[in-house]
Amino acid sequence: MLDEPVQFVHTQQLDFKKSVLRYLPAQSPQGLLNKKVLLVGLGAIGGYMADALTKIGAGIESDFVLVDKDQFLAENVSRHLLGLLYCGQFKASAIKQHLAENTFFQQKKFDVKLKTSHHLIQSFLRKTILI
């Protein structure tokens, strides 16, 4: 016999790809699936952009490259997506970690660059849909 009553738990299967496609407009039914995306700068605006782009498919089936050489500092907390937990980390790595922990997204296609090089940008200009 159990000492406590049995509690029923509701379970639900989550399909991130379906959840991304569900709310996209008809003129762009695939969102950023299969699109290579380069995001340079992960400050107050760039951090929120990375989060939003992930939620519409960036990096699910193609590359999503995050570029920022700066470290996240305590003075950034009031205006940034990241919180105190990430202070002292490089922004690109911290954003990648945040997205891995806070979305259904499997971060297999993420690449993190701490420096922007002319060569990197040139190579992406030839094959990237969104910069």
Question: Where do the protein language model's features map onto the residues?
Answer:
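Glycine/serine-rich phosphate-binding loop and adjoining beta1-alpha1 elements at the start
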Residues: 1-36
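Generic recognition of flexible, low-complexity loop/linker segments
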Residues: 24-28, 53-54, 119-122
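Beta-sheet entry/capping signal
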Residues: 1, 36-37, 63-65, 109, ...
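Glycine-rich phosphate-binding loop and adjoining beta1-alpha1-beta2 segment
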Residues: 65-105
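A structured beta-alpha segment of the ubiquitous adenosine-cofactor-binding alpha/beta core
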Residues: 96-130
